[in-house]
Amino acid sequence: MISMVFKRKEAGITDYSKRLKLLKSREKRFIVRITGKGVIAQVAEYSDIGDRILFTVTDKTLAKYGVDLRGNNIQVCYLVGYIAGIESEKNGVESAVLDTGRRKFRKGGRIAACLKGFTDAGIEVPHGEDVFPDKKRIDGKHLKSPVKISEIVKNFKKMEEKA
C-alpha cells in the first residue's frame, strides 16, 4: 500500500503537527515569515474554508509611516512587529499565538524582535521575557550608523494620537 503524503508536507512548506497544535488553541495567530529580502507579519484566524488573514504588514509598509528602512534585520523586524501590533488593536485583536512556520525560533533573533514589537504595541502573546533581543541590538548600537528605533516608535505614538 502506498501512503499519500500531503503536497505541502512533502515540499517542506507546512508542518501539519505544529499547525494542528496552533489551531487547537483557538486563538488568532501572529504569523512571522522572514524572507531573503524582507519580513512579513500577519494576523490570521481559522475558518472552515481556509485561514482568514485579518491584515498583513511587510517591510515595505514602513514607508507609509515615514520610515525609510528596508530589509530583514532586527530593527526592521521590530518595527514591522510594532506596526502589526497597532493594526491588531485597530482590528480588535487582544491576544494571539506566535506562528513561525517551518523556521526555528531563536532567542534574540529576528522573529523574537518581531514578537517584541508586537507585544510592545500592547498585544498579549505567550512568551518568556528572556527570548527578546537586547535593547542595544534593537536600537542598532552594534551598527556603524545606528537607527534610533525609540524615536521612530515615539513618532508612531504621536501619529496614533492625531488619528
UniProtKB/Swiss-Prot annotation:
One GO cellular component, as annotated: cytosolic large ribosomal subunit
Annotated coiled-coil segments of the chain: none
Gene Ontology process terms (BP): ribosomal large subunit assembly; translation
GO molecular function, one term: structural constituent of ribosome
Record flagged with keyword Nuclease: no
Keywords, in A-Z order: Ribonucleoprotein, Ribosomal protein, RNA-binding, rRNA-binding
Assembly description: Part of the 50S ribosomal subunit. Contacts the 5S and 23S rRNAs.
Similarity remark: Belongs to the universal ribosomal protein uL18 family.
Function: This is one of the proteins that bind and probably mediate the attachment of the 5S RNA into the large ribosomal subunit, where it forms part of the central protuberance.
NCBIfam families reported for this sequence: PRK08569.1
Protein name: Large ribosomal subunit protein uL18
